Amino acid sequence: MADKPVVMHIITRLEAGGSSRNTIDSCGAQTPDYGVVLAAGPHPDAVAMAKLLPPEVNYIEVPHLQRELSPIKDLRALLELRRQIQLLQPDIVHTHTSKAGALGRLAAALAGGRKPVVVHTPHGHILYGYYGPVKTWIFLLAERILARFTDYFIALTPGEMRESVEVGLGRAPQWRVVHSGVDLKPPAVPAHKRDLGIAEGEIAVGTVARLEPVKGVEYFLRAAALLRANRPGLKFKFVIIGGGALEGPLRRLAGQLFLDQTVIFTGHRADAAALLPALDIYVQPSLNEGMGRAPLEAQALGLPAVVSRVCGLPDVIREGQTGYSVPPADAGALAISIEKLALDAGLRARMGAAAKAWALATDEAGRPRWGAESMNARLLALYKEILG
């Protein structure tokens, strides 16, 4: 690494999720120009995920780095990270996600010696939708303090950047937008309606989500109940692709809303994207979403998308052309937009065609606009800018 500038990435854990996969992709793309180090805490997926790294990347497991709050382990992780920064003397420390962002930035500040340039990618904010007001205020205060130890921030979308700057997380000149890279190739074996138990005459409306409160699936179910009551002549199937802690409560809610025969719960599916071709309309009812990969995957397959008007979701559709955005936690507004698409097959087709063109468009260099290659090129351009 002696003949190249060194970039040290720090992420809380390597798991089978978007932020981890994008960080791994970025590490691989940076090896021709940089010595690359990736430090992460332990996780059951870490061994498999680390195998995706090219051999040129120096992978370091930080034993005490974990997502959960633990003062003793957090202090140990901070000291471990400080020691690695002192040993490696990186030119750039690039932190990812909240916990690694906090400890990594503090470690860089405390390491002494030559100060690295500190870049932080939150991979979405936690300003609303996750916690109550007191806990959110504490997180916000902590992030404002940490902003003093941050040279540059990276947002996934203009919406994330705007909302972060509005609450005092850094200054606008410190922020750049670099979207997550999304693989929008069509699935090798696309699902058909019959594969999910959907009759040909039924309008399939679906969502892909971890079943936890911030994903807003409760409002998807309540919108489904409104549609069934208000439009008894339309035949719907509502598909929830994903598993999680709320699967049981959501199944019970579906029963209470008399949706037992109308809603399909697939549970966790590793091939979630392959199920999207069975749908007619895609819905993302999240209470907060940094960017939203699934709406892009759905649009790339020609589906119009209805999304919540939160953080980065409005940035991944074209309002009124490829889909609609609605206020969060508003089942009525969600139902109205779904109904508009359900009643008009021609509108669905036109929006679906526009959605496919939008999702699969190229950037100024001819790369897929939402792909990993475009993401990595923008990140490398930022590194070149900040190192002069």
Segments (PLM) and residue ranges:
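A conserved mid-protein helix/loop that constitutes part of the nucleotide-sugar donor-binding site
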Residues: 20-25, 203, 207-229, 245-252, ...
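A short, active-site helix/loop in glycosyltransferases that binds the activated sugar's phosphate group
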Residues: 148-176, 182-184
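Aromatic "clamp/platform" in nucleotide-sugar-dependent glycosyltransferases that forms part
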Residues: 268, 287
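Nucleotide-activated donor-binding/catalytic signature segment of Leloir-type glycosyltransferases, i.e.
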Residues: 251-267
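Short hydrophobic beta-strand element within catalytic cores of glycosyltransferases
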Residues: 304-307, 317
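A short helix/loop element that forms part of the nucleotide-sugar donor recognition site in Leloir-type
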Residues: 50, 80, 186-199, 204
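Conserved acidic donor-binding segment of nucleotide-sugar-dependent glycosyltransferases
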Residues: 319-320, 324-331, 340-346
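N-terminal strand-loop element at the rim of the active site
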Residues: 9-73, 163, 168, 175-177, ...
